[in-house]
Amino acid sequence: HNMTIESQRGKSEFDRLYNSSGTRKIKRGNKSIKVSDTKLLSGMVKMQTKHAGYKTAGSTQNLQDAAEVFKFAADNSKAEWRLDVYDDNGAKTAVVATKQSEDHVQNADEAMDGLAVEGNQVVNIHSHPNPLGTKGGSSDDMRNAKSSPARNAVYFKANQTLYEYNSTRSQIKGMSANTADDILRQMGLK
């Protein structure tokens, strides 16, 4: 696991997510992000503990926080991550999830399991951490896109690009995704 969460537990109005240093003595790395919704990371820690450290997911209506956590986690780990957004009559909720696997991530239904998320999926993004991996949707990704009206994209970590795909085309277009704002803007959420 490549992340360290520091919860301020009432001492602060935000949580901070750190990358891992890669050593056992000093767990916390030198990169971090602030997360305003203090329930997002604490919820992810609870779920991760329940699943022996391998699977986690969290939800928030703060799309900025969700995009920040997704991008930071994708950029600072070897695992695939996903970011889904649901629309319930104008109220949008994001889900951030991982299975801590380098070559697949849980589907949207599995990621939502145990979370109070309502509405229709409007965005489905997952990361491809392998620099030699697919720049766009894999054959499995495209097959899964058939049943969803959501906008689908792969975040390719190596070049920080979102590659939109659908059920018939692995790569419709590439879009710069250097920041969480870029991700939200490119997917029509900002």
Model region roles, listed by residue range:
Residues A74-A79:
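A short catalytic or substrate-binding loop motif that flags glycine-/basic-rich loops and adjacent residues
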Residues N2-M44, N107-K190:
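Active-site-proximal loop/helix of nucleotide/amide-processing enzymes and allied scaffolds
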Residues G58, K99-E110:
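Surface-exposed ligand/attachment interfaces on beta-rich extracellular proteins
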Residues A91-A97:
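Amphipathic coiled-coil signal-relay and dimerization helices
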Residues H51-F72, G133-D140:
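Charged, amphipathic alpha-helical segments
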Residues E80-D88, N152-Y155:
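Short beta-strand scaffold segments in enzyme catalytic cores
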Residues K34-T60:
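Short, compositionally biased leader-like segments
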